[in-house]
Amino acid sequence: MNPNVALVSINNLTVRYGAFTALDDFSCQIEEGCTGLLGPNGAGKTTLLKTLLGFITPTSGGGNVLGLDLYNGNKEIRQKIGLMPEQDCHIPGLTAVGFVAYAGELAGMPADQALRRAHEVLEYCGLGEARYRNVETYSTGMKQRIKLAQAMIHGPKLLLLDEPTNGLDPKGREEMLDLIKDISHNKGVNVLISSHLLPDIERVCDRVVVVLRGKLVSQGTIRDLKRIEGQPLDVDLRESNESFLASLRAKGAQAAPTTYTTVRVQVAGTREHAMNTILQSAKESGAQVRGVKLAERSLEEAFLTAVQA
């Protein structure tokens, strides 16, 4: 995969339902890999997914999906994308293998190929032993897995997953996230996950697009989003040392403990100058430095900063 290739390019997209604006002059780039579409409920995430699939016609703006125009390539776009919707989508009376095979046929696969592939994706999703059961007898976790299986049946270039861990218990959630991570990192399938759950996004995604009230508020790698302005350093000490803090402050550095043995340090100037200041203060105070790394905020802190800006 090339992480600099845009799979989806959205330009100044606006979607209105009557007087309500669901997407407001929205622009973003979705690159190869696994991207999280992050925002609170009602932010416009599902509207964006439906627009990408051609289920909703934008009020204004445009873009392309997998090189196809958003307005003129709807059918081709849907053939290249797999959708795992938030709501259940199974057909009553069908077995799991029958339902997934039918989804393959709807995507244009020959019946025999769709049936063979249905067995494969159900096995991959952990439903091999239950594939002949009617889907309505499935638990919530199993229904989530079959939604993923039907989205994968036709070998799409891009998977759209809408709240894929919705309703799952902790074990089921971990297993679903493991599946998604394997699909993205080992199977080479591009994934766009819509979620309001920050831990899910951080667990499996490389990049994130943050949406609030229909507007783009931030996009980039998770590492970029977590980066702290000014790039302070976290110094890990063997034990707490007040003299170390005093020495740093005497040299003009900003220094504050974040845990009992960790000090966050910010020094004006180059990174080399900052390291020299830290090492000199450690020597003067007798502090034992176990490690130094770039300080990061949590994804939750980064998200709250973005949406409150």
Summary of predicted features, one role per range:
Residues 101, 105, 112-130:
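Conserved ABC ATPase "signature" region
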Residues 8, 22-23, 78:
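Conserved structural motif at the start of ABC-family nucleotide-binding domains
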Residues 159-163:
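Catalytic Walker B motif of ABC-type/P-loop ATPase nucleotide-binding domains
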Residues 177-268:
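ABC transporter nucleotide-binding domain
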Residues 61-72, 76-77:
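Conserved ABC transporter NBD signature motif
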Residues 40-44:
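Walker A (P-loop) phosphate-binding loop of ABC-type ATPase nucleotide-binding domains
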Residues 155:
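Conserved catalytic motifs of ABC-family nucleotide-binding domains
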